[in-house]
UniProtKB/Swiss-Prot annotation:
The protein, known as: Methionyl-tRNA formyltransferase
Keyword list, A-Z: Protein biosynthesis, Transferase
Gene Ontology CC terms, in alphabetical order: cytosol
Organism: Shewanella sp. (strain MR-4)
Enzyme class: transferase
Function: Attaches a formyl group to the free amino group of methionyl-tRNA(fMet). The formyl group appears to play a dual role in the initiator identity of N-formylmethionyl-tRNA by promoting its recognition by IF2 and preventing the misappropriation of this tRNA by the elongation apparatus.
Positions contributing to (6S)-5,6,7,8-tetrahydrofolate binding: S112, I113, L114, P115
EC number: 2.1.2.9
Pfam families assigned to the protein according to its UniProt record, in alphabetical order: Formyl_trans_C (PF02911), Formyl_trans_N (PF00551)
Amino acid sequence: MKPLNIIFAGTPDFAARHLQALINSHHNVIAVYTQPDRPAGRGKKLTASPVKELAVSHNIPVYQPGSLRKEPAQQELAALNADIMVVVAYGLILPKVVLDTPRLGCINVHGSILPRWRGAAPIQRALWAGDKETGVTIMQMDVGLDTGDMLLKTYLPIEDDDTSATLYEKLALQGPDALLQALEGLANGTLTAEKQDEALANYAEKLSKEEARLDWSKSATQLWQEVRAFNPWPVSYFEHQGNTIKVWQTQVSTTSSNAAPGTIISASKKGIEVATGDGVLTLLSMQLPGKKPLSVADILNARGDWFTPNTRLNHEAQ
């Protein structure tokens, strides 16, 4: 297969994994587009994206326009004369003129099985909703939000102990292989594009800190899903004794209870059991203000007085 001349557009670490795979392949990455450097850290020093750092280390030209809507930026991209543009978590809207510029158009690596979970947070929403599987879709980009024709899909079962952090890692391994496979199919003309079924489409809204507050009136199963979805960000939490306590790990208990939602049923080294709107949730790992995440056994040693049975955890902001 003849090597393709590729423009790569991406910004975070997830994108950098895909760029690395392209660099390692026989294809030519002729240019990289990434978001402008942003202030980061305590000193608010201007920091390059992971994609830019990788590109610079391989002497690949880097472009960082604030927008691709203006003609000079579009002409600059067209002058690169690329066969295809690969887009992974870039963060800028690509207007139609840009989508139509490369010979084979623009393709995108998306972290869900489309048309389910279009949008910004597909990995987190799959966990939040209790989906049993997720995966990667390579699609031909159009002007809509993740609405383009699907070129290739790979599947990944979601395990009970998966969090957004672990799924991110698994998909960051699966995505590059799927991308290389799709590029081979496109170059050889062996891929058949499949239209998305609009009736099955839904949107993965961005997560918010407000949404991470545990509402004990929900079911234990839903809360267990949320804790996994919001790990590592924004991290589920509840308010108690005037403090915000983060919850990193839970499981659904087999204990039954008629207690009011938010009531502690039992507290032991094995976990703190809390009544919910439906079922009982066992808290296994938590984080007190200013401390590291700890097992419940360690939390009870430090603050056992906060978590005595029949105490009602206050999920309203103080």
